């Protein structure tokens, strides 16, 4: 997906609409959250922020020690809060955060101005796409993406680009929601969820992506369902922040019906 050809719904959602301002994404991290250990009796906006931070931590812990030596990049960084968290809490050697949307890069630089000043040589926000990453060959130790790959039009070029920019032995970590296989699944999701109907989200079967990764030269590809710690917590928070009939309440239904699930994927470059 060339950054000069952003799909209209992606351009609008992360441009003029600025999804981070929605109450359901309190805190600006723009992910569904990892709710393990959070009391769901009456979740607060602070709990929502914590859930989103925890999803980043779940991803970043997948990188091996000593992390202080690792040069990382994030694909689909949004407002860039996750990249700042990565440096602050995990002390990676450097993190370069990439997003296809120029408005998001502008916001990331503004929101994280203090972090950029604190880590002038270790934190950066730059324009780029999953299919054309702005890095030389073999230049990174790690690459990660948090709830962004569902917006990529296809994942084959992302897998190939990840393999290109990672050094041998480098690690890719991706988390987002993937679908069950089959054209009928994609059609059912379009009926249930407006984000699939309008093209914001793309139905990517999990098995197709793991095949792309092995085809690109990745080894030790592992997948883990983390849906039980994502969907119930998200839906409980949505119950207090959106109308009862809002389409986002159907994510829980889609998960329970086996149409999609939230996964954590790790893969090492051969």
Give the residues covered by each predicted segment:
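Conserved alpha-helix/loop element of class I SAM-dependent methyltransferases that forms part
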Residues: 34, 50-69
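A short acidic, Gly/Pro-enriched loop at the edge of an enzyme's catalytic core
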Residues: 131-142
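Short, glycine-/aromatic-enriched active-site segment of Class I SAM-dependent methyltransferases
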Residues: 177-200
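Class I SAM-dependent methyltransferase SAM/SAH-binding core
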Residues: 73-132
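Conserved catalytic loop of SAM-dependent methyltransferase domains
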Residues: 219-244
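Short alpha-helix
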Residues: 201-217
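N-terminal auxiliary segments of SAM/dcSAM-dependent transferases
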Residues: 1-27
């Amino acid at each position: 997906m060339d950054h000069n050809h952003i799909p209209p719904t992606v351009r609008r959602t992360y441009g003029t609409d600025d999804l981070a301002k929605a109450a359901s994404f309190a805190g600006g991290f723009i992910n569904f959250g990892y709710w393990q250990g959070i009391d769901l009796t009456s979740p607060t906006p602070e709990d929502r922020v914590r859930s989103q931070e925890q999803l980043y931590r779940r991803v970043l812990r997948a990188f091996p020690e000593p992390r202080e030596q690792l040069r990382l990049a994030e694909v689909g960084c949004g407002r860039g809060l996750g990249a700042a968290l990565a440096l602050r809490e995990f002390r990676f050697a450097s993190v370069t955060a990439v997003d296809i949307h120029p408005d998001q890069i502008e916001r990331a630089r503004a929101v994280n101005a203090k972090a950029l000043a604190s880590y002038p040589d270790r934190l950066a926000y730059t324009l780029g796409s999953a299919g054309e990453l702005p890095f030389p060959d073999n230049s990174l130790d790690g690459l990660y993406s948090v709830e962004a790959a569902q917006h990529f039009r296809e994942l084959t070029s992302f897998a190939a680009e990840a393999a290109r920019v990672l050094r041998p032995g480098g690690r890719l970590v991706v988390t987002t929601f993937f679908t069950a296989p089959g054209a009928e699944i994609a059609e059912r999701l379009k009926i249930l969820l407006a984000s699939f109907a309008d093209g914001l989200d793309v139905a990517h079967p999990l098995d197709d992506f793991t095949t792309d990764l092995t085809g690109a030269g990745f080894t030790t590809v592992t997948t883990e369902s983390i849906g039980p710690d994502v969907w119930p917590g998200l839906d409980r928070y949505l119950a207090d922040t959106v109308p009862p009939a809002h389409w986002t309440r159907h994510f829980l239904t889609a998960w329970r019906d086996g149409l999609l699930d939230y996964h954590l994927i790790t893969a090492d470059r051969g």
